[in-house]
């Protein structure tokens, strides 16, 4: 019997999108419950908190066979380990996590710029090129389509999600980073990812 999986988040990409990409890549069926899709998001979220456990009073929340999982980064790591896309050795698991942590750093800076209009010039002229250079160098060193080892890990999906997000606001951000651009094109054309993106609804963030 297949386990029942429900992902709870707002009607947006945000902190849930990497989780959705992991499920898409793996071909795992789940219910994508979005607050605000058919009504008031905050009223729906308030009612949800009355019904379900929310350890930190926030989403995303993942429910698998009546177990509640909270915190987006912890969920990503758990799923990656469970479904064997976390790296095929202890060292590769470390490298994947290292890259994932780097993605969180620059994604945080992008969100401050995109959502809160903070330091846009600094982000575009300094932070984005700097971090893109870091990722470009890692790809160059690994010398293949993947960031870690010779197979896909959640680090690849995390970097793809980062630039998929950034390029909705700042197109051509990867024009000076050929390996990173090729990587994103490679991930976007994986059959399950391509199908997910082509059917993904538009969202404000």
Curated annotation (Swiss-Prot):
It comes from the Eukaryota. The keyword Transferase applies. Glutathione binds at residues 58-59, 71-72, 105, 117, 121. The keyword Metal-binding does not apply. InterPro entries: Glutathione-S-Trfase_C-like, Glutathione-S-Trfase_C_sf, Glutathione_S-Trfase_N, GST_C, GST_superfamily, Thioredoxin-like_sf. One of its GO terms (molecular function) is glutathione transferase activity. Keywords: Transferase. It catalyses: RX + glutathione = an S-substituted glutathione + a halide anion + H(+). Coiled coil: none annotated. Its EC number is 2.5.1.18. One of its GO terms (biological process) is glutathione metabolic process. Belongs to the GST superfamily. PANTHER family: GLUTATHIONE S-TRANSFERASE. This is Glutathione S-transferase. It comes from Plasmodium vivax. The gene is GST.
């Amino acid at each position: 019997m297949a386990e029942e999986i429900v992902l709870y988040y707002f009607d947006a990409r945000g902190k849930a999108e990497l989780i959705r990409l992991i499920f898409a890549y793996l071909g795992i069926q789940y219910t994508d419950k979005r607050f605000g899709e058919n009504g008031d998001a905050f009223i729906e979220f308030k009612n949800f908190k009355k019904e379900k456990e929310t350890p930190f009073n926030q989403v995303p929340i993942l429910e698998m066979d009546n177990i509640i999982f909270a915190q987006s980064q912890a969920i990503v790591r758990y799923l990656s380990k469970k479904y064997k896309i976390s790296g095929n050795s202890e060292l590769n698991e470390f490298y994947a996590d290292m890259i994932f942590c780097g993605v969180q750093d620059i994604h945080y800076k992008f969100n401050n710029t995109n959502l809160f209009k903070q330091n846009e010039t600094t982000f575009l002229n300094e932070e984005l090129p700097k971090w893109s250079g870091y990722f470009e160098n890692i790809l160059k060193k690994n010398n293949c389509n993947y960031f870690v080892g010779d197979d896909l890990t959640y680090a690849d999906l995390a970097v793809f999600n980062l630039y998929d997000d950034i390029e909705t606001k700042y197109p051509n951000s990867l024009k000076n980073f050929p390996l990173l651009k090729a990587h994103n094109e490679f991930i976007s054309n994986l059959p399950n990812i391509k199908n997910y993106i082509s059917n993904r609804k538009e969202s404000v963030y």
